[in-house]
Amino acid sequence: MATRGTTSKSKTELAEEMDNMGAKYSAHSDREYTRFSLQVHSGDAARAVNMLGDMVCNNSLNSAELELVKDEVSAEHEDNHNRYQETTLENAHFNSFREHMLGQPIKGDRDLTHTIGVDHLKDFHTANYYGDNIIVVATGDVSHEQVVDAVQQNFHSLPKTTSVQ
Protein backbone atom coordinates (compact mmCIF):
# COMPACT_ATOMS: atom_id res chain seq x y z
CA MET A 1 0.00 0.00 0.00
CA ALA A 2 3.02 2.31 0.33
CA THR A 3 2.95 3.38 -3.32
CA ARG A 4 -0.85 3.60 -3.53
CA GLY A 5 -0.90 7.23 -2.44
CA THR A 6 -0.28 9.50 0.51
CA THR A 7 -2.26 12.31 2.06
CA SER A 8 -0.35 14.75 -0.18
CA LYS A 9 0.28 12.72 -3.39
CA SER A 10 -1.72 10.32 -5.52
CA LYS A 11 -0.18 7.05 -6.66
CA THR A 12 0.30 8.63 -10.11
CA GLU A 13 2.16 11.59 -8.60
CA LEU A 14 4.39 9.25 -6.58
CA ALA A 15 5.20 7.21 -9.69
CA GLU A 16 5.92 10.36 -11.72
CA GLU A 17 8.21 11.74 -9.02
CA MET A 18 10.14 8.46 -8.93
CA ASP A 19 10.38 8.44 -12.73
CA ASN A 20 11.58 12.06 -12.79
CA MET A 21 14.37 11.16 -10.36
CA GLY A 22 15.25 8.01 -12.26
CA ALA A 23 14.55 6.16 -9.01
CA LYS A 24 14.28 2.41 -8.72
CA TYR A 25 11.70 1.53 -6.05
CA SER A 26 11.39 -1.85 -4.40
CA ALA A 27 9.50 -3.27 -1.44
CA HIS A 28 9.75 -6.65 0.20
CA SER A 29 7.93 -8.27 3.11
CA ASP A 30 9.23 -11.26 4.99
CA ARG A 31 8.30 -12.88 8.26
CA GLU A 32 10.40 -10.52 10.36
CA TYR A 33 10.54 -7.27 8.41
CA THR A 34 9.24 -5.09 5.62
CA ARG A 35 11.73 -3.15 3.49
CA PHE A 36 11.11 -0.16 1.26
CA SER A 37 13.98 1.16 -0.83
CA LEU A 38 14.64 3.82 -3.41
CA GLN A 39 17.81 3.62 -5.44
CA VAL A 40 18.65 7.14 -6.66
CA HIS A 41 21.57 9.31 -7.74
CA SER A 42 23.53 10.62 -4.75
CA GLY A 43 22.23 14.16 -5.28
CA ASP A 44 18.66 12.93 -4.79
CA ALA A 45 19.22 11.10 -1.48
CA ALA A 46 17.40 13.69 0.65
CA ARG A 47 14.53 13.78 -1.86
CA ALA A 48 14.30 9.96 -1.71
CA VAL A 49 14.17 10.06 2.10
CA ASN A 50 11.41 12.67 1.78
CA MET A 51 9.41 10.33 -0.49
CA LEU A 52 9.93 7.30 1.77
CA GLY A 53 8.94 9.36 4.80
CA ASP A 54 5.78 10.50 3.05
CA MET A 55 4.89 6.93 2.03
CA VAL A 56 5.52 5.52 5.52
CA CYS A 57 4.15 8.35 7.66
CA ASN A 58 1.34 9.74 5.51
CA ASN A 59 -0.04 6.74 3.65
CA SER A 60 -3.61 7.43 2.57
CA LEU A 61 -4.78 3.84 3.27
CA ASN A 62 -7.52 4.24 0.68
CA SER A 63 -10.24 1.57 0.80
CA ALA A 64 -10.57 1.42 -3.02
CA GLU A 65 -6.83 0.82 -3.37
CA LEU A 66 -6.99 -1.75 -0.58
CA GLU A 67 -9.55 -3.73 -2.57
CA LEU A 68 -7.19 -3.77 -5.56
CA VAL A 69 -4.32 -4.93 -3.37
CA LYS A 70 -6.48 -7.66 -1.83
CA ASP A 71 -7.27 -8.94 -5.33
CA GLU A 72 -3.54 -8.98 -6.14
CA VAL A 73 -2.74 -10.82 -2.89
CA SER A 74 -5.49 -13.37 -3.56
CA ALA A 75 -4.00 -14.03 -7.00
CA GLU A 76 -0.55 -14.44 -5.39
CA HIS A 77 -2.04 -16.89 -2.89
CA GLU A 78 -3.39 -19.00 -5.74
CA ASP A 79 -0.09 -18.81 -7.59
CA ASN A 80 1.92 -19.76 -4.48
CA HIS A 81 -0.51 -22.57 -3.66
CA ASN A 82 0.41 -24.14 -6.99
CA ARG A 83 4.14 -23.86 -6.25
CA TYR A 84 5.07 -26.85 -4.17
CA GLN A 85 8.25 -25.31 -2.75
CA GLU A 86 6.37 -22.25 -1.46
CA THR A 87 3.61 -24.41 -0.01
CA THR A 88 6.15 -26.71 1.66
CA LEU A 89 8.00 -23.78 3.25
CA GLU A 90 4.77 -22.20 4.50
CA ASN A 91 3.69 -25.54 6.00
CA ALA A 92 7.11 -26.09 7.58
CA HIS A 93 6.97 -22.68 9.25
CA PHE A 94 3.42 -23.29 10.44
CA ASN A 95 4.27 -26.71 11.89
CA SER A 96 7.44 -25.40 13.55
CA PHE A 97 6.00 -22.24 15.08
CA ARG A 98 2.20 -22.79 15.14
CA GLU A 99 0.67 -19.85 17.02
CA HIS A 100 3.80 -17.67 16.92
CA MET A 101 3.88 -14.96 14.24
CA LEU A 102 6.75 -16.78 12.51
CA GLY A 103 4.34 -19.61 11.80
CA GLN A 104 1.88 -17.40 9.95
CA PRO A 105 1.94 -17.05 6.15
CA ILE A 106 3.90 -14.06 4.87
CA LYS A 107 0.98 -12.82 2.77
CA GLY A 108 -1.56 -13.67 5.46
CA ASP A 109 -4.21 -16.35 5.61
CA ARG A 110 -5.67 -16.72 2.14
CA ASP A 111 -9.11 -17.48 3.57
CA LEU A 112 -9.08 -14.22 5.58
CA THR A 113 -7.57 -11.81 3.03
CA HIS A 114 -11.00 -10.54 1.98
CA THR A 115 -11.85 -9.56 5.59
CA ILE A 116 -9.03 -7.03 5.97
CA GLY A 117 -10.18 -3.43 6.11
CA VAL A 118 -8.58 -0.01 6.35
CA ASP A 119 -8.99 -0.05 10.15
CA HIS A 120 -6.91 -3.26 10.31
CA LEU A 121 -4.14 -1.55 8.34
CA LYS A 122 -4.26 1.53 10.56
CA ASP A 123 -3.98 -0.65 13.67
CA PHE A 124 -1.06 -2.56 12.12
CA HIS A 125 0.64 0.70 11.18
CA THR A 126 0.23 2.09 14.71
CA ALA A 127 1.57 -1.12 16.26
CA ASN A 128 4.58 -1.53 13.97
CA TYR A 129 5.61 1.76 12.36
CA TYR A 130 7.31 3.80 15.07
CA GLY A 131 10.73 5.35 15.51
CA ASP A 132 12.45 2.58 17.46
CA ASN A 133 11.27 0.05 14.87
CA ILE A 134 12.49 1.85 11.73
CA ILE A 135 15.97 1.93 10.25
CA VAL A 136 16.90 4.35 7.48
CA VAL A 137 20.07 3.56 5.54
CA ALA A 138 21.77 5.57 2.81
CA THR A 139 24.83 4.28 0.98
CA GLY A 140 27.17 5.74 -1.59
CA ASP A 141 28.42 9.26 -2.12
CA VAL A 142 25.80 10.99 0.02
CA SER A 143 26.02 13.70 2.64
CA HIS A 144 25.45 12.12 6.05
CA GLU A 145 24.20 15.43 7.45
CA GLN A 146 21.68 15.89 4.63
CA VAL A 147 20.34 12.37 5.11
CA VAL A 148 20.05 12.79 8.90
CA ASP A 149 18.28 16.14 8.41
CA ALA A 150 15.91 14.56 5.86
CA VAL A 151 15.11 11.67 8.22
CA GLN A 152 14.43 14.04 11.12
CA GLN A 153 12.28 16.24 8.90
CA ASN A 154 10.28 13.46 7.24
CA PHE A 155 9.88 10.84 9.97
CA HIS A 156 9.32 13.19 12.93
CA SER A 157 5.56 12.52 13.01
CA LEU A 158 6.10 8.89 14.04
CA PRO A 159 6.09 8.23 17.77
CA LYS A 160 9.40 7.02 19.19
CA THR A 161 7.80 3.91 20.69
CA THR A 162 4.51 2.12 20.27
CA SER A 163 1.66 2.44 22.73
CA VAL A 164 0.24 -0.91 21.62
CA GLN A 165 0.88 -3.79 23.98
Question: Predicted segment positions?
Answer:
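Charge-rich, well-structured scaffold segments of protease-associated domains
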Residues: 13-164
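Active-site SXXK
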Residues: 1-6
